[in-house]
């Protein structure tokens, strides 16, 4: 498995991933998979700008969106968004990382592998402490975070939803090498 940034030849796979979330009437997670883009070309430009910190909306921090693929396929299994640093809002509930696996590929261990690969990217970016949050009722996501060294700091209530805040420090990055 590997994380990639999309190029022009991934248009159909990108559309397929988005379509699967829509068919299942699910919120597209992470938001950066599509953002506010109407087209794939617009997505590619926005992703590049986000990575460089260009033309960001107020309150948005630079981020990199990666997609999980197997080593021998272009099929997009999931996506993970790495935010370069935390602002006040992200420190409270958004965290450094947001991720999602397409509905048909869940419960196969992909999220755990994807997060482990993303933590390696964080290491390359010299992000030494990672905050990841999830809803308390999202037990699968909590397990993914814990398997990758996440330590629960606390729980907060946001818009009536209990969110758990986990920290992973650089010395914990190599916990899961799945």
Give the residues covered by each predicted segment:
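GNAT-family acyltransferases
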Residues: 1-96, 160-178
């Amino acid at each position: 498995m590997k994380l990639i940034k999309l190029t022009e030849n991934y248009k159909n796979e990108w559309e397929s991933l988005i379509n699967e979330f829509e068919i299942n009437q699910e919120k597209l997670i992470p938001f950066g998979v599509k953002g506010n883009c109407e087209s794939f070309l617009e997505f590619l430009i926005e992703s590049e700008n986000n990575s460089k910190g260009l033309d960001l909306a107020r309150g948005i921090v630079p981020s990199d969106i990666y997609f999980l693929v197997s080593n021998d396929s272009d099929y997009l299994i999931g996506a993970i968004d790495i935010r370069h640093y935390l602002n006040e809002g992200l420190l409270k509930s958004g965290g450094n990382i947001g991720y999602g696996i397409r509905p048909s590929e869940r419960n196969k261990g992909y999220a755990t592998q994807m997060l482990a690969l993303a933590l390696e990217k964080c290491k390359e970016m010299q992000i030494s402490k990672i905050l990841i949050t999830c809803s308390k009722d999202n037990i699968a996501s909590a397990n993914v975070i814990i398997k990758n060294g996440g330590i629960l700091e606390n729980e907060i209530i946001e818009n009536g939803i209990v969110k758990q805040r986990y920290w992973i420090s650089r010395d914990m990055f190599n916990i899961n090498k799945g």
